[in-house]
C-alpha cells in the first residue's frame, strides 16, 4: 500500500518536473527566436512606468513575435502611447506611429458605438423590434427579435462572429437619416469631423501602412497552453466539438476567409486571407475595422467624455444586460454582454465593469468608465487566445491597475 502511494508520488513529481521543463524550454526557444531588445518608441507618463516596462518585456521575452501598439487615455489625456517590433518581420519593416492593423472582433465595438449614437439621437431604441425598421427581417420566425437581441448575440443564443456586422449594418442603414452604412457614417460623422484615423475596410491606396498578420504555430500553441492551462480549455471548446456542431461549422470558413489553418513548422506562420487587399477593403463591420491603438483609444475617449454620447445613453452602455448564467452555443461560456459590448469585472471595484470588445489573436479594447480610462492594444502577431487570456495584454492590464 505504501509502495503504491510512493509510486504515485514519484509519477506526480515526474509529471510536474516534465511540465516545468517543457514550459521553460519552450519559453527559451521563443526568446532565442523572437527576442527584441530595442526600446519601444513613443512616450508614457512617469506614473505608468510599470506599464511601459510590461510592454517592453513582452518583446524581451519573445512573447510578441511581430509588432504591437499600446495607447492609454485617462480623462482625455494620452498617458501611454508606445509601439515596437515589426509591421512585417519577413521584410524587417518596422512598426511606426502610422502603422495600422486589422481589429478583428474589436470592430464590433465600433459598430455598437455608431448604433449607440443613433439611439442617442432618438432614431431607435434598444428595446425596439428589428421589424419596426426592417420588416423583411421578420421571416422564418425572427419577428420578435429586438435590437438588443442582435447586439448581445441572443438571436439563436450563439455568437455571430461575422454576421453580427451585417445585421447591425442592416439596422443602421434603415435608421440613419441618410441611409448610410456604418462604414460611411463612421467616416463622415466621426473620422473626418474629429480627425480620427479609423475605418471599416481599407482602400488599396492606404494598404501601405497596414501591418501583415501572422498566425501562431503549433509550438506557440504548446507554449501558451503550458503558460496558462485555461488556453487548452478554450482550444478544446473550439476544436473538440463534433463536426456537426455550431462551433465546428463556424470555424470551417470558406477559403476567402481562412483564419484557423496552422502550419507545423516552428519558424513559419500560415497563410492568412485577411492579408489580401481584396478582402481587407470589404465593408464588414464585425471584423474589418482598421486602426492603430492611438486612434482606437481616441474614438472611445470621445465616446465617454460626452462628445459623441450624452449621459443618458452612456448610462445604458456601461452596464451589461446579460449577467446571469447562460450557455452560449459557440464558445460554451457565459460571456457578460450588453448593447454590443463585452464586459469584465472591474479589477478594483467588484460592483463595476470594464467594457469594450476583445478581438481574435489578442486585439483589445477596454473602457473603465469609473476612472475615465481607455486602453487599446493592437498587434499583428496573433496569439492563441483572445485578450481575455492573452499573456501580453493581461500583464499590461495588471501593471496598469497597480499604477493607479
Regions found by a protein language model. Name each.
Residues 284, 305, 318-328, 385-404:
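Short, gly/Ser/Thr-rich active-site loops of penicillin-recognizing serine hydrolases
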Residues 2-33:
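Terminal signal-anchor or tail-anchor transmembrane helices
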Residues 52-58, 76, 100-127, 168-172, ...:
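Active-site SXXK
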Residues 215-293, 319-374:
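Active-site Gly/Thr loop motif
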Amino acid at each position: 500500500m505504501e509502495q503504491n502511494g510512493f509510486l504515485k508520488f514519484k509519477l506526480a513529481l515526474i509529471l510536474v518536473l516534465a511540465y516545468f521543463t517543457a514550459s521553460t524550454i519552450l519559453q527559451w526557444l521563443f526568446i532565442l527566436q523572437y527576442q527584441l531588445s530595442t526600446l519601444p518608441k513613443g512616450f508614457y507618463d512617469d506614473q505608468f512606468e510599470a506599464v511601459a516596462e510590461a510592454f517592453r518585456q513582452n518583446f524581451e521575452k519573445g512573447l510578441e513575435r511581430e509588432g504591437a501598439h499600446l495607447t492609454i487615455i485617462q480623462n482625455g489625456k494620452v498617458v501611454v502611447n508606445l509601439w515596437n517590433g515589426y509591421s512585417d518581420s519577413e521584410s524587417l519593416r518596422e512598426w511606426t506611429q502610422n502603422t495600422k492593423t486589422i481589429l478583428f472582433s474589436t470592430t464590433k465595438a465600433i459598430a455598437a458605438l455608431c448604433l449607440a449614437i443613433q439611439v442617442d439621437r432618438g432614431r431607435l431604441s434598444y428595446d425596439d423590434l428589428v421589424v419596426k425598421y426592417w420588416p423583411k427581417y421578420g421571416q422564418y420566425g425572427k419577428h420578435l427579435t429586438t435590437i438588443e437581441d442582435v447586439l448581445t448575440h441572443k438571436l439563436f443564443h450563439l455568437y455571430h462572429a461575422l454576421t453580427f456586422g451585417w445585421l447591425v449594418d442592416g439596422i443602421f442603414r434603415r435608421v440613419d437619416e441618410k441611409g448610410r452604412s456604418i462604414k460611411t457614417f463612421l467616416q463622415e460623422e466621426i473620422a473626418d469631423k474629429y480627425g480620427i484615423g479609423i475605418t471599416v475596410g481599407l482602400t488599396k491606396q492606404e494598404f501601405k501602412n497596414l501591418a501583415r498578420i501572422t498566425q501562431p504555430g503549433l509550438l506557440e500553441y504548446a507554449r501558451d497552453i503550458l503558460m496558462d492551462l485555461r488556453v487548452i480549455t478554450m482550444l478544446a471548446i473550439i476544436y473538440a466539438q463534433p463536426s456537426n456542431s455550431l462551433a465546428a461549422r463556424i470555424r470551417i470558413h470558406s477559403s476567402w476567409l481562412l483564419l484557423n489553418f496552422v502550419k507545423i513548422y516552428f519558424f513559419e506562420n500560415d497563410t492568412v486571407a485577411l492579408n489580401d487587399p481584396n478582402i481587407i477593403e470589404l465593408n464588414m463591420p464585425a471584423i474589418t475595422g482598421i486602426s492603430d491603438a492611438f486612434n482606437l483609444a481616441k474614438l472611445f475617449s470621445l465616446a465617454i467624455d460626452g462628445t459623441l454620447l450624452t449621459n443618458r445613453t452612456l448610462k445604458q452602455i456601461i452596464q451589461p444586460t446579460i449577467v446571469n448564467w447562460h450557455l452560449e452555443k459557440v464558445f460554451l461560456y457565459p460571456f457578460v454582454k450588453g448593447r454590443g459590448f463585452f464586459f469584465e469585472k472591474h479589477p478594483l471595484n467588484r460592483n463595476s465593469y470594464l467594457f469594450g470588445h476583445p478581438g481574435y489573436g489578442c486585439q483589445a479594447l477596454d473602457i473603465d468608465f469609473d476612472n475615465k480610462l481607455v486602453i487599446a492594444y493592437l498587434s499583428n502577431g496573433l496569439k492563441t487566445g483572445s485578450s481575455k487570456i492573452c499573456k501580453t495584454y493581461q500583464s499590461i492590464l495588471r501593471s496598469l491597475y497597480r499604477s493607479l
